[in-house]
């Protein structure tokens, strides 16, 4: 059994895999070492990988190294099953790469657009030759709502949850519809352009996908575990890579 860990800006997710099959998933906003220890003791995985968009405590890294026969902290020097065509690979988010790998292994030899809607929105492209070609980063829903409140004197801070009419009928719905409809049109344009120019298939993932998956058009594959699946593929690749040396 393998354990894969995706520590994002807001939520930490854990996936347990047997081969390529997802057996169980967990998530938390509060990272406690006792919680990790309980999972490791209960399921006794043999190998694991962790990627993080923020600093990881040394105590957690030590626990994982001591508990697993093989442990990899996913950094940009780790061998990958994709080629990277990006001018600053050291600054490239490992979560973006994991999502790209997860999509690639599901739809080999296709051009792929990978959209991850979380705290931030990332839009990445992998071509049919398995080359990651880069992408864009935009503000996620909460960041947009926070920005409207923070950078103005009178606009309230509101939640993503609630009515989203095509035209706001009060200040709250005007803000929410402006943000959420704006994201729909933004992502819809990306999907349409990549389908036309690259004949790309689109993957959607991320914690905020639920707000948009039914409102976007195109050839869409929604996979809430895409990053975890990609990390699992990267972990499997490490074992194959180092055995071949």
UniProtKB/Swiss-Prot annotation:
As recorded in Swiss-Prot or TrEMBL, the protein's gene is named: coaX
Q: How is the cofactor bound?
A: A monovalent cation. Ammonium or potassium.
Any GO MF annotation of the entry: pantothenate kinase activity
Binding positions for substrate per the UniProt entry: 86, 93-96, 171
Binding annotation for ATP: 6-13, 119
Q: Which GO terms describe its biological process?
A: coenzyme A biosynthetic process
> What pathway, per the record?
Cofactor biosynthesis; coenzyme A biosynthesis; CoA from (R)-pantothenate: step 1/5
Q: Does Kinase count among this protein's keywords?
A: yes
Q: What is this protein called?
A: Type III pantothenate kinase
């Amino acid at each position: 059994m393998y354990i894969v860990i995706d520590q994002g800006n807001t939520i930490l997710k854990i996936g347990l895999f047997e081969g390529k099959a997802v057996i169980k998933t967990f998530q938390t906003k509060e990272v406690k070492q006792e919680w990790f220890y309980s999972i490791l003791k209960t399921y006794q995985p043999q190998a694991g990988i962790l990627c993080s968009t923020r600093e990881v405590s040394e105590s957690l890294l030590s626990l994982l190294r001591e508990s697993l026969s093989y442990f990899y902290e996913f950094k940009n020097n780790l061998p990958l099953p994709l080629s990277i065509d990006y001018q600053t690979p050291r600054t490239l988010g490992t979560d973006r790469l994991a999502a790209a790998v997860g999509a690639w292994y599901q739809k080999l030899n296709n051009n792929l657009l990978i959209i991850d809607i979380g705290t931030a929105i990332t839009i990445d492209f992998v071509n049919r030759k398995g080359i990651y070609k880069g992408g864009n980063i935009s503000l996620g829903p909460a960041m947009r709502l926070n920005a409207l409140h923070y950078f103005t004197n009178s606009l309230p801070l509101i939640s993503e949850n609630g009515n989203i009419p095509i035209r706001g009928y009060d200040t709250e719905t005007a803000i929410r519809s402006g943000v959420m409809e704006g994201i729909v049109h933004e992502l819809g344009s990306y999907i349409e352009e990549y389908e036309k120019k690259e004949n790309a298939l689109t993957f959607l993932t991320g914690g905020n996908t639920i707000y948009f998956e039914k409102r976007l058009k195109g050839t869409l594959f929604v996979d809430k575990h895409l990053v975890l699946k990609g990390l699992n593929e990267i972990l499997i690749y490490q074992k194959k890579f180092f055995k071949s040396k």
